[in-house]
Curated annotation (Swiss-Prot):
The keyword Methyltransferase applies. It is an enzyme of class 2 (transferase). Its EC number is 2.1.1.261. One of its GO terms (biological process) is indole alkaloid biosynthetic process. GO terms for molecular function: methyltransferase activity. 4-dimethylallyltryptophan N-methyltransferase; part of the gene cluster that mediates the biosynthesis of isofumigaclavines, fungal ergot alkaloids. The tryptophan dimethylallyltransferase ifgA catalyzes the first step of ergot alkaloid biosynthesis by condensing dimethylallyl diphosphate (DMAP) and tryptophan to form 4-dimethylallyl-L-tryptophan. The second step is catalyzed by the methyltransferase ifgB that methylates 4-dimethylallyl-L-tryptophan in the presence of S-adenosyl-L-methionine, resulting in the formation of N-methyl-dimethylallyl-L-tryptophan. It comes from the Eukaryota. Pathway: Alkaloid biosynthesis; ergot alkaloid biosynthesis. Keywords: Alkaloid metabolism, Methyltransferase, Transferase. Belongs to the methyltransferase superfamily. This is 4-dimethylallyltryptophan N-methyltransferase ifgB. Gene3D superfamilies: Vaccinia Virus protein VP39.
Length: 340
């Protein structure tokens, strides 16, 4: 375990857990009410998410894996030799492993980092890797947020001047509103691609499926309910780390709600009360959730061709390559900064 821990670099600019209660309070004090995504990615939350995302009906993961297994050799051709490759969100490396194996086969000198908020999940991820297979690809991990990772690439001697390739798998960009997705990509580009724009890129996945039945089956698959409710236990821990005082949330008061928003082209995930008014506890006991009120915690935007081009263009990026396989709604795109 000591060897594994030595591979993990702490790049946190602040302890993100400290800010989550403030984000929870702010989100529940507005209309419509929301909960921050960070609340859902505790160690327990991530384990439930992995169970959910590996369910048979959760097509995004299965389609990503099909594409990566079929097209990884082509995809690594787009990654420059001597690159630093960062997976911005590595709850599981099963999707990245085909890419690492293809990079090793190409004999490119690559330094790969898995980035995650959870130290324990990074430990688990690194323990599962077959290091003996890799001679050209060096493997490590970064403990921090997306923002920490991008800043680390920009500022770190010995890293900042090398080509960068950032992986945004798992439909990560779809979790942001369309304007915020463009800003997110623009921030990555200006900080992590600008030093070597010709050789640096983003590899991301997007989903074009707008068939309500397929989407709803996926996002109500096994594991999603415990994933959603684990956030409430995590919230209780953050508001009362010593387990003293009244709980903010009673998980037994809540249902998970899954909806397709046809007008906005997105899936919406919310928590609702079990048909009754709920007053929160502890420091949030002045907040009341009405019986028909939704607390949204996640959206997954789907992108058709026109929406993709608006997204990339608004971020100052251009898609230079695309990879998919027949029958898949998911595709991977290589993005680079637009020439001046």
């Amino acid at each position: 375990m000591t060897i594994i821990n030595s591979r993990i670099i702490d790049i946190r600019q602040s302890t993100f857990e400290e800010s989550i209660p403030d984000q929870v309070t702010a989100g529940l004090s507005t209309t419509p009410k929301t909960l921050p995504a960070l609340l859902f990615y505790s160690g327990e939350g991530i384990r439930h998410w992995i169970e959910h995302s590996t369910a048979a009906d959760f097509y995004p993961r299965h389609e990503e894996l099909r594409i990566l297994r079929a097209r990884a050799a082509e995809m690594v051709d787009s990654i420059a030799n001597n690159s630093v490759v960062v997976d911005l969100g590595s709850a599981s490396l099963d999707k990245v492993l085909p890419l690492l194996e293809a990079l090793e086969a190409s004999k490119k000198n690559i330094t790969f980092y898995a980035l995650d908020l959870s130290f324990s999940e990074l430990q688990s991820t690194l323990q599962s890797l077959p290091y003996e297979q890799f001679k050209f690809v060096k493997i490590g991990a970064l403990h921090g947020t997306f923002e920490d990772g991008v800043q680390w690439l920009k500022d770190t001697p010995g890293v900042q001047d090398r080509p960068h390739c950032l992986l945004l798998f798992g439909l990560t960009v779809g979790n942001y509103s369309r304007p915020n997705a463009a800003k997110f990509l623009q921030n990555i580009a200006s900080n992590a691609l600008a030093a070597s724009p010709v050789q640096s890129s983003i590899l991301l996945s997007l989903d074009s499926c707008k068939m309500p039945t397929k989407v709803l089956r996926a996002y109500t698959a096994e594991g999603v309910v415990p994933f959603a409710l684990a956030s409430l236990d995590y919230g209780n821990t953050l508001f009362a780390p010593n387990k003293m005082g009244e709980k903010v949330f009673q998980p037994s008061d809540w249902y998970f709600l899954s909806e397709w928003n046809y007008m906005l082209g997105r899936h919406e995930a919310s928590l609702i009360t079990k048909g009754k008014e709920v007053r929160l506890g502890g420091p949030l006991n002045d907040i009341v959730i009405e019986k028909h009120e939704k607390i949204r915690f996640g959206c997954s935007y789907k992108y058709d061709t026109d929406e993709r081009q608006v997204l990339f263009g608004s971020a100052g990026l251009t898609d230079v390559k695309e990879w998919s396989v027949e029958g898949c709604d998911v595709s991977f795109y290589q993005l680079q900064m637009c020439p001046n």
